[in-house]
């Protein structure tokens, strides 16, 4: 059996792996930065500072798909970025910052993810995007957020958005049990699995959007992440959901799996 990488090293890798030295944009494409997705006059200074998004808009194309991307970092760190592997591929990318622990606690992270997604539904047509082709994705903590707002209807319903209108859910190695940081807030150790209303697994349902679960190698992933996702796949099937898929990227650990997962994400989108 392959040696499990340490939790600390894996988390550090998540936080630094996406630093982009330069982003090569195609002519006539655009990268718009630091757009607030809450009301601009919000009285909360942390919301004004943190709750921003960037948009990459592809060149010379209309009614394009849009990937809403949530970064990883354990709900305690990380920074928005537009993945370079998604640039100039005929899709828009909306990269989202959300509030982090310890400045906030659950469910603030999910509230922000829902608010940003609602902003995209209401605004992406202005940039040429198709509201019927909005994909919610993210790595690690970002994958957890993607599943929570896609499976638990209440978060987007607060913005009068129906979560079933999401085109695809594509989490990269996301917790399907209650997130370890949420468990820590409640005094539960990260080695103690918990499934409650803050777990994607709690919200398994037949009529959810199509769900593509991508993980790294089961022997290299952190804290049983492959097995969590495999159980999610099984229970969605048991619930009667016809479009749940599970992909294991052999040879890649929790941090490394994101790079090949981006290519898989593009393939999934273009095969629809």
Short names for language-model regions:
Residues 23-61:
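N-terminal cap/lid segment of alpha/beta-hydrolase-fold proteins
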Residues 160-164, 168, 174-182, 191-230, ...:
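The feature captures the conserved acid-bearing segment of alpha/beta-hydrolase catalytic domains
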Residues 79-96:
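Short amphipathic alpha-helix adjacent to the substrate-entry channel of hydrolases
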Residues 121-184, 196:
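Primarily recognizes the serine-hydrolase "nucleophile elbow" in alpha/beta-hydrolase
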Residues 105-125:
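Alpha/beta-hydrolase active-site loop
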Residues 63-72:
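Short beta-strand element of the alpha/beta-hydrolase
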Residues 214, 230, 237-272:
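C-terminal catalytic histidine-bearing segment of alpha/beta-hydrolase fold enzymes
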